[in-house]
Design a protein with these regions (language model features):
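A short, charged, amphipathic alpha-helix used as a generic interaction element across diverse proteins
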Residues: 24-60
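Short N-terminal "domain-start" leader segments
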Residues: 1-26, 60
């Protein structure tokens, strides 16, 4: 089984994607919705950036 070190999540209150260590991510937080788990930091960072770019494009 792959150890999932990182998580990308969408925070509804601030309308933005973030990443954090999986061990620190609070699954029970009301406004945070996980979208990707991985142990590949580069993938996590790229996914977060691309998702935020899409959000910005949709807001124009």
């Amino acid at each position: 089984m792959i150890d999932k070190k990182y998580v990308v999540y969408y925070h509804e209150k601030v309308n933005e994607y973030f990443y954090d260590y999986y061990s620190r991510f609070n699954m029970n937080e009301q406004y945070s919705k996980p979208v990707l788990y991985s142990d590949d930091f580069e993938l996590i960072e790229r996914a977060k950036n691309e998702l935020n770019e899409r959000l910005q494009e949709q807001s124009y």
